[in-house]
Amino acid sequence: MAVPARTCGASWPGPVRTARPWPGRGPRPCPDPRGPASGPARPLLLLLPPLLLLPLLTAPGASAYSFPQQHTMQHWARRLEQEIDGVMRIFGGVQQLREIYKDNRNLFDVQENEPQKLVEKVAGDIESLLDRKVQALKRLADAAENFQKAHRWQDNIKEEDIMYYDAKADAELDDPESEDMERGSKTSALRLDFIEEPNFKNKVNYSYTAVQIPTDIYKGSTVILNELNWTEALENVFIENRRQDPTLLWQVFGSATGVTRYYPATPWRAPKKIDLYDVRRRPWYIQGASSPKDMVIIVDVSGSVSGLTLKLMKTSVCEMLDTLSDDDYVNVASFNEKAQPVSCFTHLVQANVRNKKVFKEAVQGMVAKGTTGYKAGFEYAFDQLQNSNITRANCNKMIMMFTDGGEDRVQDVFEKYNWPNRTVRVFTFSVGQHNYDVTPLQWMACTNKGYYFEIPSIGAIRINTQEYLDVLGRPMVLAGKDAKQVQWTNVYEDALGLGLVVTGTLPVFNLTQDGPGDKKNQLILGVMGIDVALNDIKRLTPNYTLGANGYVFAIDLNGYVLLHPNLKPQITNFREPVTLDFLDAELEDENKEEIRRSMIDGDKGHKQIRTLVKSLDERYIDEVIRNYTWVPIRSTNYSLGLVLPPYSTYYLQANLSDQILQVKLPISKLKDFEFLLPSSFESEGHVFIAPREYCKDLNASDNNTEFLKNFIELMEKVTPDSKQCNNFLLHNLILDTGITQQLVERVWRDQDLNTYSLLAVFAATDGGITRVFPNKAAEDWTENPEPFNASFYRRSLDNRGYIFKPPHQDSLLRPLELENDTVGVLVSTAVELSLGRRTLRPAVVGVKLDLEAWAEKFKVLASNRTHQDQPQKQCGPSSHCEMDCEVNNEDLLCVLIDDGGFLVLSNQNHQWDQVGRFFSEVDANLMLALYNNSFYTRKESYDYQAACAPQPPGNLGAAPRGVFVPTIADFLNLAWWTSAAAWSLFQQLLYGLIYHSWFQADPAEAEGSPETRESSCVMKQTQYYFGSVNASYNAIIDCGNCSRLFHAQRLTNTNLLFVVAEKPLCSQCEVGRLLQKETHCPADGPEQCELVQRPRYRTGPHICFDYNATEDTSDCGRGASFPPSLGVLVSLQLLLLLGLPPRPQPQIHSFTPSRRL
């Protein structure tokens, strides 16, 4: 019988689908099915009503068999559902475990998590912790100002007059080519003994402070020696602070001269290469030294700016960008006759890490041409700063102009935009070696409350691109006590190895009189800082009473997370803060945007939302219900949130009887403790215990067997009410040990696992116990021993029914090894316990299926046999039969796919070793059909904390921060020779002996060779999850003469999709694969140019000091130059070039003449 042709748009009862005529029968008006996988239309499939899938539609080459009818496949699905449910009822022991809990009701209490009370208590505890650090900060800042005020400046001070511990001395003394070894150290350097201190993750000495001085600052200068002299008195204040608060970590004074004095003393963690650390460029120092900034950088790219000068400008702009933090806003433009932005950003944008990277890359593309037009550059900059339609800092406003010089003062522009109020500061930078008159540049800066700087060579860049902060600090200093505001930073990596920290900062002012009369000094002395480790804040949050899927988080005014379980940067750069937005830490939706805004505004709130969450292994998406509760943390810029699933409203707390507690016996004598001993494993199953901090003296270990051994040894000495142990954790562990042992006794021990092809049965609990039976199955158990960190545990709690988890397979790895019957599929389900009106889920139970045996069972259940022992039905030429998954596995593909799109079971023997792979890697054509028919939907997100393999080497070495490799054109350029000669004279004469090692080429950065280390990057993630289709569907994959019929149906009470399809007969059905594997994003995630058009809500610090009527702007920079003798310089340059060894360009560092305070 011929099947009537159907035109596009034909429909049948149920969801309407775009259809095509049966292949080869009638017109083909539909679009090409091999088009894009996504888009507004999905014309790939023809869905047919069940009545049309008649036995007459036979598969080619199998005339006696037809594609199974829908009711047949639904029957197979029911058989699969019944088999799974039966095995789980017998072996899972859900009902029996409920009864065990109720039988032991006297051993535990049910406690309630009250979100509002919890979050307010934690916020109060964090506030108290930070307040203690604030008090210590204030004592330090006050003391520092008094010490400096009382200090008498010494012009004739010598190095040997100063005793201090040089934090880099030990490393330098080990290096025979170090600065001190080469010139002979004149300092009276202290040599200290150190003790290991776990709290600091370092060796420390509590009796002294340590001093770190940047490599490019001369230790013996008068300014530095005087700084060391007066700051020595801080040592006693540091020590007293620690006496009052033993929990204090690093206490640091960062001086405006570049000196860092910190307590307790510890050797500097200098890399083997050059140490580029300068406290003045650290995020916490910059935040404490000035108020937020709106900055426009304009760069002269006229024709006179070429060669070395243009390269100096590019490097200077990049260094300037590094002085900005997330509270600042910036744009960069180039100008000649006209001005234009260097990047895609057309207005001020937040100076976050990703935006600054866009600027830095764009700056490298600047080309010199045309004539200088200061007017165009300044008008563009003022227009940018006057744009009120965008988010910005709304505090300090400034223009930074880099040029090689010019005659125009553009007074008319300043009169129009900036005078008489002069709300915008203008900083001018004369770049390169030239003979231009710099008076106009000085005038621009001096008449607009700015400063004039000269950058004649590479060595002057770092110091001269950061000293503008001293000018911005003037209003803060003049404001006096009003400006004494403690600020808390973003999260960043501690330079001394403490890990992730936040720092409280307080500016330190110069209280001395400046000059004759009562003129007040305007200079900032530096910034005082105290670190707080994130781990110390985390300890104040409830960990295990919130359940596996409950957590506490905190954000700042930028929306960046301070605390969050997903804040786990794999690579950290100590120069930049760790900035993970709350909406990037979770899967973004409108509800979370509202929560984030409310928290930034400092409001309280509570909201229950339905949202998507990513599984711990980042392979699955679940739709869940979460309760969010949040409050501000007083006296800080942080806000605290609590997230609880409804089933975590209650939790169990073990209640060991008073009689046992009064005995004062070791815990090892308690009832049920014997079931933790390895001697019981053979009969009771293997026990894994979560590696939690049960007691202070418990030695941690990544090996669970070793950890269990350490735990048992300690329990031989500890009593149940010991003060050194966490009784909640300890008692719940003992309780769950006994509970799970009774499950073995009542259910598992009497069952024959082999009968049902099971490799193991298991139970995991909130108390931290994972019991696997039989004991031998533990050898192949690969799940995390901490249930709260096990994906199967967390997903089972969030989903009802049976959750299948196939073994994880990466497409790049070799297929599964099926030998020795050790490969299994986990099936787990949560145990829901109702006690009165209180419902909770304290445990998860499950089985581990033998993959190969269940693959055979799967074929039988999806066949025309009623049971396994029945012979296969034979279908002769004269009779008509439906195909099934057992007899016709050469023509019919039958698979079970989980809700993430991963293969669980197949009737194809050659696919057994592909179990656990994303199904698109197994059958791309069929997976695309399932996606296009809404059986699956997908969620794309970005991982901003990923680590990527090193990129192929390009321009490596320490050179990016300042080494210019001259071209042939530069050698022929007289200006380059003059510049290079002048710098070489300065560099060689002053530092040739001191820093000899710098002139030895080393193709590595200061932190180590980029060829051998991973770098931080952004990865795009795609997860698939079940779509809106719950019914049983039949469809056809239309691809010319090779169309395929398929049927798909969700299995009730599981996370499985049952799919039956014709096997593809030719390559015409080949289509592009859907990708699930994480992929690298070269552009650092979503297009930044588009994102800045939709900026996320934020607010800056609530304080701003950008103006003071008493500010003295007369100190605005004065240029100085000397007329070079060209003959002498060229001769000297030739001599120096000939004297250098034939090696790559040296790493050049600068001498920085410091100013007297």
UniProtKB/Swiss-Prot annotation:
This is Voltage-dependent calcium channel subunit alpha-2/delta-2. One of its GO terms (biological process) is organ growth. It is a single-pass type I membrane protein. SMART domains: VWA. Residues 488-577 form the Cache domain. Residues 24-34 have a biased composition (Pro residues). Belongs to the calcium channel subunit alpha-2/delta family. The alpha-2/delta subunit of voltage-dependent calcium channels regulates calcium current density and activation/inactivation kinetics of the calcium channel. Acts as a regulatory subunit for P/Q-type calcium channel (CACNA1A), N-type (CACNA1B), L-type (CACNA1C OR CACNA1D) and possibly T-type (CACNA1G). Overexpression induces apoptosis. GO terms for cellular component: GABA-ergic synapse; presynaptic active zone membrane; voltage-gated calcium channel complex. One of its GO terms (molecular function) is voltage-gated calcium channel activity. It is found in: Membrane. PROSITE patterns: VWFA. N-glycosylated. The gene is Cacna2d2. InterPro entries: Ca_channel_alpha-2/delta, VDCC_a2/dsu, VWA_N, VWF_A, vWFA_dom_sf. Disulfide bonds join 446-1104. Residues 294-472 form the VWFA domain. It comes from the Eukaryota. Residues 19-1119 are extracellular. Residues 1141-1157 are cytoplasmic. Glycans are attached at residues 205, 389, 421, 510, 543, 627, 864. CDD domains: vWA_VGCC_like. It comes from Rattus norvegicus. The keyword Transferase does not apply. The chain crosses the membrane at residues 1120-1140.
